[in-house]
UniProtKB/Swiss-Prot annotation:
Phenotype upon gene inactivation: Embryonic lethality.
Alphabetical UniProt keywords: Cell wall, Cytoplasm, Glycosyltransferase, Secreted, Transferase, Vacuole
Protein name: Alpha,alpha-trehalose-phosphate synthase [UDP-forming] 1
Record's subcellular location: Vacuole; Secreted, Cell wall; Cytoplasm
UniProt function note: Required for normal embryo development, vegetative growth and transition to flowering. Regulates embryo growth, cell wall deposition, starch and sucrose degradation, but not cell differentiation. Involved in the regulation of glucose sensing and signaling genes during plant development.
UniProt KW Glycosyltransferase keyword: yes
UniProt similarity note: In the N-terminal section; belongs to the glycosyltransferase 20 family. In the C-terminal section; belongs to the trehalose phosphatase family.
Top EC group: transferase
Length: 942
């Protein structure tokens, strides 16, 4: 949207995320203040308050109608207000996508529909929010198979700013009643998956999941049809977990947020779901993922870490450089609506009647859906125990329980209804009299006015949810208690406990004794303590409104997109394959340096299971690379080096049949496939630290399940990739602390930390440090007479080894003379004491780029010659990796440059890593395969 503050480019972007969010908050407050000064504000007009206050009656429908239909008036008013500000402001379009529209449709004729507004929690959250121009997308709740009916309904809904998604009966049955209500909802509330003993039922799960994905795609199709550039798409709840992925596949630049209104279970619960990985990855496609509480957000990040093996950060979840922000956004209510309602004559009359009806008795209140997670039986049993232990209260207290029926056709809910009725009847029969009973139970909902009156006269509200995303009944009770200042007893398993816990009495609803004791505490609480508790909760409810919740979420979503754009600007672009191939074909002498692990390795088919340890530890060349590698190796103008941290035996097994150079253990060992292994660094490295480090690695391997360590000639590696992620990190931290203060405190070693590994290697053993010497061996072996004018370096290298990318990096502009590295002559390159040839020298301006550690290592070795051990003595007898003839005498003086490399002919590319020194990126080994196939085709073509 042109001119939109969220889309325009600004010459100044605040440095920090917090600064940007604070500035946006100030602008919102300023606009609210301007609107408050205008008496014609449609949404904020107080003269209509009496007609706007009913949850389930005509007044509620009028209130929401006013919100949905008053867009034009609101926008006109906004324009008038914003003209008073420094600059104009255009409201951002917000596409709210939920399973159900905030209307119920009834067909009156072939092309006639009657629409009834149903003010649910989500609608209430957005009532009065004038920051956005909202459109609602969802299912209308009816099956409309004919085209005439669909067009008529779409036209009628358009007047309400609603857009329908048409789902047939079979989809609704499988997707909504099946997968959403029978699988996801119970799982997210810790009720577990259905326990079935028939294969047919298992097959029905598969069909339900397929319907779930299909329905989400249908929602995405409607969103895509109405999407305009700059819109924010806000997806809601567990019904639409696949929607973010579907939307991003359509338009990767779309701003997508997803919010869950239920709890998110612990990773141990979520991992029981057969489709666990698909759902998590689909949600991670969103830019911002929101939950009611930090606990739910933490569980989600933990599930992504433990199930998908991704990196969890304080900001969210990171996958190959892309960050999905995960945060808590506690929802609220429209508190002013409840406060104003207490002044309505109808509510005042209700309050008077209730006070007269229950005069002389303390009133306790429970308002719940008749649902398994609401803990109604536990609440009533706790009340029974209280009456049993406190005979003096039996005729002084009454419990009013409002149980709104839901899913009355489901056997489990019918059983719950019977159970509640049985308990209530037993208690009333035991403690009741001819004139009064201790429990008044209603199986129906109350209108808004009656509910507000009931809240206002209540002394103690009792919320005993076994699991609840938030539970706004507690908020509504607090909002109506400004005069009475009653006490809130709140389940610690309700999301509201995180927000109202300081002022409420928190209880474990499963502990009947504790709840009964809390009832006594609440009824006997002093007025002073009640006032303090209420003041805290009332302030929270007043300030953390539903409108503020919606504005905060969308504001953070917009800023998350800005943050992502800033992050992406620092990420190298994707490898320009066409350009790389063209320059390859035009060059005369090419050098290809390829990593192995996570670059040329085969994919592991683990059917969505993370960490198939046995298969992944056995590194194998990607089967589709055999042909391309042979074609590239057969080209006399192309030299290929596989540069890997793997051992010599692994490289021999995978590349023995190819005509290429193999550099094992980060370039420490080198050989042409038809030759013998040689060392590229001095043999006498200080390796006295090996035994003590190995002892430490063994200790932590024994105490970290599924971890292992590898012993190589120049390094030791402890790997915890397959261990529990969090436990592995703790163990790695302790291991490093022990190493630094003990075995390697004075040793000449480098410690390299991978994402799931710790490596200790001899000082100076890096891929970049070895390249200079490898290059000299290659030039000497091939008797090159033409300088190398094209270099391609591709790999998934750890940060310590990324100096291989910068080794060839020209520092002059591409239009200036090429960088030249001279081949040293025999008289200028003095030999070391062991007879090793020193590395070719670099141009002066490259002296600090790589190889500096090698120099320090050589000096260290010369100074500590008495403590050195030959690497050859470390090899096991019978090894095929003999170092015989590992060194050749220096060649005769060569009068030409080894490298004649210009900037445009150098392509460094990181695989699966976005934080890199490389110029370009490739996403995965499969992308490497695709590129090398194209390169091989160029080599094969005449």
């Amino acid at each position: 949207m042109p001119g939109n503050k969220y889309n325009c480019s600004s010459s100044h972007i605040p440095l920090s995320r917090t600064e940007r969010l604070l500035r946006d908050r100030e602008l919102r407050e300023k606009r609210k203040s301007n609107r408050a000064r205008n008496p014609n504000d449609v949404a904020g007009s107080s003269e209509n308050s009496e007609n706007d206050l009913r949850l389930e009656g005509d007044s509620s429908r009028q209130y929401v109608e006013q919100y949905l239909e008053g867009a034009a008036a609101a926008m006109a008013h906004d324009d008038a207000c914003e003209r008073q500000e420094v600059r104009p402001y255009n409201r951002q379009r917000l596409l709210v996508v939920a399973n159900r529209l905030p209307v119920s449709a009834v067909r009156r004729g072939e092309d006639s529909w009657s629409l009834e507004i149903s003010a649910g929690g989500l609608v209430s959250a957005l009532l009065g929010v004038k920051e956005f121009e909202a459109r609602w997308i969802g299912w209308a709740g009816v099956n409309v198979p004919d085209e005439v009916g669909q067009k008529a309904l779409s036209k009628a809904l358009a007047e309400k700013r609603c857009i329908p998604v048409f789902l047939d009966e079979e989809i609704v049955h499988q997707y909504y009643n099946g997968y959403c209500n029978n699988i996801l909802w119970p799982l997210f509330h810790y009720l577990g998956l259905p326990q079935e003993d028939r294969l047919a039922t298992t097959r029905s799960f598969q069909s339900q999941f397929a319907a779930y994905k299909k329905a989400n795609q249908m929602f995405a199709d409607v969103v895509n049809e109405h999407y305009e550039e700059g819109d924010v798409v806000w997806c809601h709840d567990y019904h639409l977990m696949f929607l973010p992925k579907c939307l991003k596949e359509y338009n990767s630049k779309m701003k997508v947020g997803w919010f869950l209104h239920t709890p998110f279970p612990s990773s141990e619960i979520h991992r029981t779901l057969p489709s666990r990985s698909e759902l998590l990855r689909s949600v991670l496609a969103a830019d911002l993922v929101g939950f009611h509480t930090y606990d739910y957000a933490r569980h989600f990040v933990s599930a992504c870490t433990r199930i998908l093996g991704l990196e969890g950060t304080p900001e969210g979840v990171e996958d190959q450089g892309r960050l999905t922000r995960v945060a808590a956004f506690p929802i609220g209510i429209d508190s002013d609506r409840f406060i104003r309602a207490l002044e309505v004559p109808e509510v005042i009359q209700h309050m008077k009647e209730l006070k007269e009806r229950f005069a002389g008795r303390k009133v306790m209140l429970g308002v719940d859906r008749l649902d398994m997670i609401k803990g109604i039986p536990q609440k009533i049993l706790a009340f029974e125990k209280f009456l049993e232990e406190n005979a003096n209260w039996r005729d002084k207290v009454v419990l009013l329980q409002i149980a709104v029926p839901t899913r009355t056709d489901v056997p489990e809910y019918q059983k719950l209804t019977s159970q509640v009725h049985e308990i209530v009847g037993r208690i009333n029969g035991r403690f009741g009299t001819l004139t009064a009973v201790p429990i008044h139970h209603l199986d129906r909902s109350l209108d808004f006015h009656a509910l507000c009156a009931l809240y206002a006269v209540t002394d103690v509200a009792l919320v005993t949810s076994l699991r609840d995303g938030m539970n706004l009944v507690s908020y509504e009770f607090v909002a109506c208690q400004e005069a009475k200042k009653g006490v809130l007893i709140l389940s610690e398993f309700a999301g509201a406990a995180q927000s109202l816990g300081a002022g409420a009495i928190l209880v474990n609803p499963w502990n009947i004794t504790e709840v009964a004791a809390s009832i006594g505490q609440a009824l006997n609480m002093t007025a002073e303590e009640r006032e303090k508790r209420h003041r805290h909760n009332f302030h929270h409810v007043k300030t953390h409104t539903a409108q503020e919740w919606a504005e905060t979420f969308v504001s953070e979503l917009n800023d998350t997109v800005i943050e992502a754009q800033l992050r992406i600007s620092k990420v190298p672009p994707e490898l320009p394959q066409h350009d790389a191939i063209q320059r390859y074909s035009k060059s005369n002498n090419r050098l290809l340096i390829l990593g192995f692990n996570a670059t040329l390795t085969e994919p592991v088919d683990n059917q969505g299971r993370r960490g198939d340890q046995i298969k992944e530890m056995d590194l194998n060349l990607h089967p589709e690379l055999k042909g391309p590698l042979k074609a590239l190796c057969s080209d006399p103008s192309t030299t290929i080096v596989v540069l890997s941290g793997s051992s010599r035996s692994v490289l021999d097994k995978n590349f023995g049949e190819y005509d290429m150079w193999l550099a094992a253990e980060n370039g420490m060992f080198l050989r042409l496939t038809n030759g013998e292994w040689m060392t590229t660094m001095p043999e006498h490295l200080n390796m006295e630290w090996v035994d003590s480090v190995k002892h430490v690695f063994k200790y932590f391997t024994e105490r970290t399940p599924r971890s292992h360590f590898e012993t190589r000639d120049t390094s030791l590696i402890w790997n915890y990739k397959y261990a529990d992620i969090e436990f592995g990190r703790l163990q790695a931290r302790d291991l490093l602390q022990h190493l630094w203060t003990g075995p390697i405190s004075n040793a000449s070693v480098d410690v390299v930390q991978g994402s799931r590994s710790v490596e200790v290697r001899a000082v100076g053993v890096t891929k970049g440090a070895a390249i200079d010497r490898i290059l000299g061996e290659i030039v000497h072996s091939k008797s090159m007479t033409t300088p190398i004018d094209y270099v391609l370096c591709i790999g998934h290298f750890l940060g310590k080894d990324e100096d291989v990318y910068t080794f060839f990096e020209p520092e002059l502009p591409s239009d200036m003379p090429a960088i030249a590295r001279s081949r040293p002559s025999s008289d200028s390159g003095a030999k070391s004491s062991s007879g090793d040839r020193r590395p070719p020298s670099k141009s002066t301006h490259n002296n600090n780029k790589s190889g500096s550690k090698s120099s320090s290592s050589s000096n260290s070795n010369n100074n500590n010659k008495s403590s050195q051990r030959s690497l050859q003595s470390e090899r096991k007898s019978g090894s095929n990796h003999s170092l015989g003839n590992s060194r050749r005498p220096s060649p005769e003086k060569i009068s030409w440059n080894v490298l004649d490399l210009k900037g445009e002919n150098y392509f460094s590319c990181a695989v699966g890593r976005t934080r890199t020194n490389a110029r370009y990126l490739l996403g995965s080994p499969d992308d490497v395969v695709c590129f090398l196939e194209k390169l091989a085709d160029t080599t094969s073509s005449p």
